[in-house]
Amino acid sequence: MPFDARTRPLTAPQARVLATLLEKSRTVPDSYPLTLNSLLAGCNQKSSRDPVMQLTESEVQQALDELRQQTLVLEIGGARVARWEHNFTRGVGVPDQSAALLGLLMLRGPQTAGELRINAERWHRFADISSVEAFLDELQSRSDDKGGPLVTLLPRAPGAREPRWAHLLCGPVDASLAQMASASPASRSEEDGALAQRVQALEDEVAALRATVQRLCEQLGVAEH
């Protein structure tokens, strides 16, 4: 049975954990699947996150356990340290392109189709805005037997040129609160978006280096400092 957010919506920690696994599988594939520590750092990073969260290790572990019950994440064995990967595309029943858009909406909040195309650059390269809109329309028109719509188009906020899209994985969206968030100046211009991408790229490089060190420590049987 496909995932149905109408009957069992994700909690905020679950959405952050799931979206972070989606992101890292695409941006730092050499470090993926993720250890609990790497996942915690990704969930709480300050760039490319809206809102910024401060989850604890126990909260992330609880979210993983709950997501595993829904077969949305998988624990990978065979290593000294447990690693985790998402099972989003199969568990929710969407293609990779749609998974990228949903992951971005979970991590960054409501966005226009144009913002999604820019922010998805390191996840999936959409040919143009029309291709983004085509996948969004498909997600919005999902039939009830497939779990119902997964995104909604919000009313255009006062002063905004374009309406924003929001995900429904955590249940119905309060349009008034979403409009208030979209009215804030943080990270909405193209220049800010480009800067955020550069910061994200640097953070991903650091994460990849840490993962390499951790793997070497596991192979050598020494503790990481």
Curated annotation (Swiss-Prot):
Organism placement in taxonomy: Bacteria, Pseudomonadati, Pseudomonadota, Betaproteobacteria, Burkholderiales
InterPro entries: DUF480, WH-like_DNA-bd_sf, WH_DNA-bd_sf
Species per Swiss-Prot/TrEMBL record: Acidovorax sp. (strain JS42)
Pfam family of the protein (one): DUF480
Superkingdom of origin organism: Bacteria
Membrane-crossing residue ranges in chain numbering: none
HAMAP family given in the database record: UPF0502
Record family assignment: Belongs to the UPF0502 family.
Protein's recorded name: UPF0502 protein Ajs_3392
